[in-house]
Structure formats: structure tokens, C-alpha cells
Amino acid sequence: MKHYEVEIRDAKTREKLCFLDKVEPQATISEIKTLFTKTHPQWYPARQSLRLDPKGKSLKDEDVLQKLPVGTTATLYFRDLGAQISWVTVFLTEYAGPLFIYLLFYFRVPFIYGRKYDFTSSRHTVVHLACMCHSFHYIKRLLETLFVHRFSHGTMPLRNIFKNCTYYWGFAAWMAYYINHPLYTPPTYGVQQVKLALAVFVICQLGNFSIHMALRDLRPAGSKTRKIPYPTKNPFTWLFLLVSCPNYTYEVGSWIGFAILTQCVPVALFSLVGFTQMTIWAKGKHRSYLKEFRDYPPLRMPIIPFLL
């Protein structure tokens, strides 16, 4: 059996970093990364990007050497992705923060609203409902991270955790400050507005969870398999008939419900920013589906049925 020789060069300087002799033709990029780490332990596999061209796209870990457009002497170009951190760690950190921060304002710990309000409780029922909804949302996210989500990528750049936490933690503090403020004003339309908002929030939370479970069942544990998601017997998944990312649709709906419930400007802004970001993600995933699957349902839109 003919073996390959693999030369790894720096994508920026073209400097030769490593030469691997007698590499199996069936070796994957993941295995080549492991071999490279043996000579350069500071660059563990998760922070390596290997490509055929210095300015080209990164090769996938599952790509097989003999199936790449290279000869028996292959040249790969290396880029350092920087320090990496697991997606699970990032999600747990960015979701635990808002849960804890919101409760600090809810219980009115000292140095927030003034001494006379320390550890006092709001007289408005909607404030307590808002705390329950907010806490439920982030506890759900934490549990889904631990027991439901299956990540196609194991890590992300370490710097992202600071950006993500600033976003989630900052908005949580901003909205919690006003919702739990001693001078907070309840919703204009009273009980009817609260009931409507709670219904929207609960339905969308159930829908979001249902979509996450459906997506989980599409990907076997430990794999990166991608399939077209279709509706199941669960009515909440029927939104797959119209959009590619109904989990985002339900997520946006949850925050709209929370904004109606609290009638709070920071919540409305958080919903708007979240919708903008999730629309970008949804469009990206929608394009990937269309590119990867020729039989992808043509009626689907990225996030909003018939519109967007």
C-alpha cells in the first residue's frame, strides 16, 4: 500500500513546520492534526486550521487524505485559531450569569436600590411572574446544554466567551434593574396583558424545547451527521413546514412574550437585538441546507414564515 508524505507549512510565512512520513491514505485531517501536535504540542488539534491553500477554507476533520486533490506528497497550510474553549463551557457560563444576576436584583440585595429597599419584595404580581419566567428560561437553557444539545464543533475561540458574557450578562442586569425597581409600573392593560404575554411565553418555550429535541434526534451521539429536519408527531415541530430554524422563531417569540409581560424597554431592545442576530444565523443555516440538500423543501424560509 502506497503511503503519503505530508508537509505542513505556516499559512502566513510559508515556513516549513512539520514533515510527516508514511501517512496512511485513509488518514483523516483529524488524525493528521494529532500527528502534528506531537511535534508542536502548543498547538493542540482544536486550535489548528489546516487547508490546501494558504487563503483557502479550513479542511474538515473528517476529510480523508486520499480523497483530497493532492499527490502522494501533500502540502497543507496551518493557521493558529488561538486558544479554544468548549461550547459546553461557554454556554454554561453565559447562561448561568443572567440567572444569578437577575436574582440579585429580584431580591434587592444591598447597594442596588438604596438601603431602605434592601431585601424588600415588590407588591406587583407581574414582577414575581417575570422572575419565574426569566429563571425558567435560563434553567431550561442550562439543562439543554448539559443533556440535549449535540455540538457539531467541540470548541470556539476563548475570546468569544467575553463577548458573549458581556451581551447576556449586561442585558440581564439592565432589564432586571428596571423590572425589579421599587418604582416599576405594571403593564398598561393589567391582567389581560399579563395573561396574553404568559400564554405567548409558555407556548414558545415549549416549542423551542420541542425543536431542540427533534434536532437532537437527527444527530447520533458523537457524530457530525446532518439531515433535513422534518416535522414529527409533536405539533410544535410542524413549524418545520414553513421555516428552517423554528427554534429561533420560538426563541424570539418567547422574548416578545416577556417584553409584553414586563412592558420594559430593555427587554424590547434585547428582543430586537436577539432577533437580528438569530436572523443572521438562520439565513446562514438556510443557505447551508439549500447547498447541501438538493431536495430541500422550497417553501421554507429561514426564520419567519413567508417573509424572512
Curated annotation (Swiss-Prot):
Instruction: Provide the protein's localization.
Output: Endoplasmic reticulum membrane
Membrane-crossing segments per the record = 87-106, 125-147, 159-180, 190-216, 246-262, 265-292
Alphabetical UniProt keywords: Acetylation, Endoplasmic reticulum, Fatty acid biosynthesis, Fatty acid metabolism, Lipid biosynthesis, Lipid metabolism, Membrane, NADP, Oxidoreductase, Phosphoprotein, Sphingolipid metabolism, Steroid biosynthesis, Transmembrane, Transmembrane helix
Q: Which Pfam families match?
A: Steroid_dh, TECR_N
Q: Any ranges marked Cytoplasmic in the topology annotation, and which?
A: 1-86, 148-158, 217-245, 293-308
- The PTM N6-acetyllysine maps to K22, K60
Q: Which residues lie on this side of the membrane: Lumenal?
A: 107-124, 181-189, 263-264
Q: Does the keyword Cell wall biogenesis/degradation apply?
A: no
Its family? Belongs to the steroid 5-alpha reductase family.
The protein depicted here goes by the name Very-long-chain enoyl-CoA reductase
- Specify the species: Mus musculus
Gene behind the chain: Tecr
